[in-house]
A protein has these predicted regions:
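Tandem repeat scaffolds
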Residues: 1-150
Length: 150
């Protein structure tokens, strides 16, 4: 289902090895996508509860309204991914890149993501625990010119 090769996909700039997949509206509970190169893939409304997405490249992927409860996302790249409305409760997100992600309405309660990179992402539009919100706000402050539309 995924690359699963010996090398780290985040260190290999060769995008020709990327496998675009469409898992929209499918159940992939406890699936293994470890070290997968799935840049630009679609996981819209997929059920990825307890799935293993560690050490992979999921940049520019569509995770809108996906269920990713207790999924392992450690050490993966999600740069530019769309997580609007996704359920990531209790997901393991430490050491992952979430640069320029869309997070409006995403449920991030209980995640382990204090040491993730949230640069350019709209984390303030997501549902967060108070302690995680403080930790993220300290490192990746909310832009001062942002006007809240709610």
């Amino acid at each position: 289902m995924s690359g699963g090769g010996a090398g780290d996909p985040r260190d290999d700039p060769d995008e020709t090895k990327s496998e675009v997949i469409d898992c929209s509206y499918q159940n992939h509970t406890k699936a293994i996508f470890r070290k997968g190169r799935h840049r630009g893939s679609t996981f819209r409304r997929a059920i990825l509860d307890e799935a293993d997405l560690t050490e992979g490249d999921f940049s520019e992927c569509d995770f809108r309204r996906a269920s990713m409860v207790e999924a392992d996302l450690m050490k993966s790249a999600f740069d530019g991914a769309d997580f609007r409305g996704a359920d990531l409760r209790k997901a393991r997100c430490n050491l992952s890149n979430f640069r320029n992600c869309k997070l409006k309405g995403a449920d991030l309660r209980g995640i382990r993501g204090k040491y993730a990179i949230w640069q350019g992402s709209d984390w303030w539009n997501a549902i967060l625990n108070e302690d995680l919100e403080k930790a993220i706000a300290k490192k990746w402050p909310r832009p001062s010119d942002h006007s809240d539309s709610s």
